Regions:
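Hydrophobic alpha-helical segments at protein termini of multi-pass membrane proteins
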Residues: 1-209
Length: 209
């Protein structure tokens, strides 16, 4: 049995100490890191509860329950940030990526502790794939929120649309992972390639301008 709340405390403790030492400018970064790990912890409990309540098998829990719960939980700190502080677009994107990155880091650490770290090649691909998938979802949500929340009429519909898009992407990723074999490695490679392609296109556009 993995006591993920103990892992959470061990990982968050140095972040809290660093946040106190770094000053107000960097405080936001550490708070979003802690929020990302916190929602990952809560997502694990909610996933387990819903899977037990719905009597879902492993595939249903992975492809149907987990993507919805995890993406909704990752959105909550961002919505709170938007409602309370009304930040600028660049700050929204940075917050979304930080939450997603912290979520992926905590998830990977828990996976390593539960399943072991003896298979380097598999862990390598999983680490990059899962991290890139969560960061890609963060990029989509962050960029989308920065656009939609500047327009009052688009806030609710835009947020729901972005949530639906990242849930679908997350579900496809989890389905490919659950299928196993070559599909599993395609799933690990796909988000990395999408992030790389996105960065390359942005670089080319900036050079043309």
């Amino acid at each position: 049995m993995t006591y993920i709340e103990n892992i959470f405390l061990c990982m968050v403790s140095p972040l809290l100490v660093a946040a106190l030492c770094m000053g107000r400018r960097q405080l936001r970064l550490f708070l979003f890191c802690i929020a990302g790990m916190g929602v990952c912890l809560l997502s694990a409990y909610i996933n387990t509860f819903l899977a037990a309540m719905c009597q879902a098998d492993a595939l249903a829990a992975t492809a149907e329950i987990a993507p919805v719960v995890e993406e909704m939980m990752k959105l909550l700190p961002l919505v709170f940030y938007l409602l309370v502080f009304e930040p600028e677009g660049d700050k929204i994107k940075a917050a979304a990526i930080t939450v997603a990155l912290a979520f992926a880091t905590f998830e990977n650490v828990c996976y390593l502790i539960q399943n072991g770290a003896d298979r380097f090649s598999f862990i390598f691909f999983r680490g990059f794939g899962t991290g890139a998938m969560h960061v890609l979802c963060g990029l989509i949500v962050g960029g989308g929120l920065a656009y939609t929340w500047r327009r009052t009429w688009l806030k609710v519909a835009g947020t729901c649309g972005l949530l639906g898009a990242v849930i679908t992407l997350h579900a496809i990723y989890n389905l490919l992972i659950a299928y196993g074999g070559a599909a599993q490695y395609i799933a690990y490679a796909l988000p990395v390639l999408l992030v790389a392609a996105g960065r390359l296109s942005i670089f080319r556009l900036s050079r043309k301008q």
